[in-house]
């Protein structure tokens, strides 16, 4: 099956799993999705992730994080979409919820948070925002 927006699919699967209070969610793996999962883990939005291989297909297994029974991720939205790409310079990167959330940005120096992109003074495509 071909997906037109694999990152949007990842976001939807994580949001749906959290609504149902699942502890884990499995999704097709790619290098880009692993980088996003690594950022989510380092920022404390998910517990952990691991790559498993089933029938020669890599699967990304994400352990979701909850606090007092509520999901840690309250908002997880795709910003740049396949039909409408959103780019931003380092100076005009948005602050998510007054700096409490993060934007995940794809830059020439790799995938990073908006905070890291501002420090390195590099802009790029705003993939999604998490709060």
From Swiss-Prot:
GO terms for molecular function: rRNA binding; structural constituent of ribosome. The keyword Transmembrane helix does not apply. Signal peptide: none annotated. It comes from the Bacteria. Keywords: Ribonucleoprotein, Ribosomal protein, RNA-binding, rRNA-binding. GO terms for biological process: translation. InterPro entries: Ribosomal_uS8 (IPR000630), Ribosomal_uS8_CS (IPR047863), Ribosomal_uS8_sf (IPR035987). It holds the Pfam family Ribosomal_S8. Belongs to the universal ribosomal protein uS8 family. Part of the 30S ribosomal subunit. Contacts proteins S5 and S12. This is Small ribosomal subunit protein uS8. It comes from Pelagibacter ubique (strain HTCC1062). The lineage of its organism: Bacteria, Pseudomonadati, Pseudomonadota, Alphaproteobacteria, Candidatus Pelagibacterales. The gene is rpsH.
């Amino acid at each position: 099956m071909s997906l037109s927006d694999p990152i949007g699919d990842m976001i939807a699967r994580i949001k749906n799993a959290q609504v149902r209070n699942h502890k884990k969610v499995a999704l097709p793996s790619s290098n880009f999705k692993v980088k996003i999962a690594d950022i989510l883990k380092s920022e404390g939005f998910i517990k952990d992730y691991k790559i498993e291989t089933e029938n020669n297909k890599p699967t990304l297994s994400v352990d979701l994080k909850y606090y007092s029974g509520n999901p840690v991720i309250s908002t997880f939205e795709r910003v740049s979409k396949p039909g409408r790409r959103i780019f931003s310079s380092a100076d005009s990167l948005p602050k998510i919820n007054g700096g409490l959330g993060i934007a995940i940005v794809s830059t020439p120096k790799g995938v990073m948070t908006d905070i890291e992109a501002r420090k390195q003074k590099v802009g790029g495509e705003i993939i999604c925002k998490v709060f």
